């Protein structure tokens, strides 16, 4: 069981699961390892399941994994899942053009542990603003489009497809996106319990190979992304409107990217410093405490027979 959320930052996971089943069915699989997708509604639920051992692997927020590892919870990041994919949305009829126009406004974020919040803080710092210059509201991402429509918030910062949902409906537009402002943005990372690493390294390696293969395949051509949308929209995975997922994949095509899954120490150090400044992590945590690079270093991207 591999846990994930119905967000496009997790799109490599449904592709990987279906690709492995296709390889087994075709008789081309190198091994019999199977990976079953388990959908969760929020990060706290995945966190609890990983901590309790109900699942052995899942996509998690990178700062949350850092914090868990620092608290001696036996988990390690073994791969990225994507890059970019967060947006700051405002109403189409609003006058906001510059980020600084949001001074004094109500802005929704998923949580203070979310990397979306760090993106927001990064944008604030560029304008010599602080979180005290806006009103921050924590809100589940699925509720954000309706809140913006009802004028309950002035803007929201979150991952896709919850920005695209409002944009496609016509009442919201993108003010800023990580694609333009934070190109190497990292949010969701593949996290595995240490006991699985110790007991079945080949299985973990196969999962990393599949995720890397899925990432390359997704970024290879638009037709592959169209196939991924059809897979992920199904009830066994995201159970979402395929038109909204398709919108994310096309507007623009690099709104979320998946091929570059390198784990670069300096990028994680930057993420940690931002988290410390935000108060969600209390002190620097050694890279090796929460990262196991061995699987990415040994990765051979799996063929995706879809």
For each feature predicted by the language model, list its residue ranges.
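Solvent-exposed, polar/charged alpha-helical surfaces in well-ordered, non-transmembrane soluble domains
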Residues: 11, 15, 48, 52, ...
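Short, glycine-/small- and polar/acidic-enriched structural segments
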Residues: 1-130, 135-138, 154-161, 171-177, ...
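Conserved C-terminal helix/tail region of periplasmic/extracytoplasmic solute-binding proteins
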Residues: 271-306
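Short, flexible, mixed-charge acidic loops at enzyme active sites
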Residues: 18-20, 245, 287
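Pocket-lining segment of extracytoplasmic ligand-binding domains
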Residues: 63, 94, 137, 142-237
């Amino acid at each position: 069981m591999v846990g994930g959320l119905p967000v496009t930052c997790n799109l490599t996971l449904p592709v990987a699961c279906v690709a492995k089943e296709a390889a087994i069915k075709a008789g081309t699989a190198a091994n019999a390892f199977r990976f079953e997708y388990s959908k969760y509604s929020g990060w706290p639920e995945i966190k609890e399941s990983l901590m309790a051992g109900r699942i052995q692997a899942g996509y998690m927020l990178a700062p949350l994994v850092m914090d868990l590892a620092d608290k001696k919870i036996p988990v390690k990041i073994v791969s990225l899942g994507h890059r970019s994919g967060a947006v700051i949305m405002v109403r189409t009829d609003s006058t906001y053009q510059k980020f600084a126009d949001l001074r004094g406004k109500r802005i929704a974020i998923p949580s203070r542990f979310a990397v979306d919040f760090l993106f927001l803080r990064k944008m604030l710092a560029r304008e010599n603003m602080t979180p005290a210059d806006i009103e921050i509201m924590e809100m589940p991402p699925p509720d954000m489009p309706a809140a913006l429509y009802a004028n309950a918030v002035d803007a929201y910062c979150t991952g896709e497809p919850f920005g695209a949902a409002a944009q496609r409906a016509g009442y919201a537009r993108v003010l800023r996106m990580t694609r333009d402002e934070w190109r190497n943005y990292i949010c969701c990372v593949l996290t595995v319990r240490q006991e699985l690493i110790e007991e079945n390294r080949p299985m973990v390696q196969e999962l990393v190979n599949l995720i890397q293969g899925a990432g390359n395949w997704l970024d290879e051509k638009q037709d592959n992304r169209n196939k991924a949308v059809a897979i992920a929209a199904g009830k066994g995975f995201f159970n979402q409107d395929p038109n909204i997922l398709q919108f994310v994949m096309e507007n623009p095509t690099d709104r979320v990217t998946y091929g570059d899954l390198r784990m670069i120490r300096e990028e994680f150090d930057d993420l940690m410093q931002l988290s410390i400044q935000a108060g969600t992590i209390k002190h620097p945590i050694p890279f090796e405490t929460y990262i196991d690079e061995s699987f990415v270093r040994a990765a051979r991207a799996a063929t995706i027979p879809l």
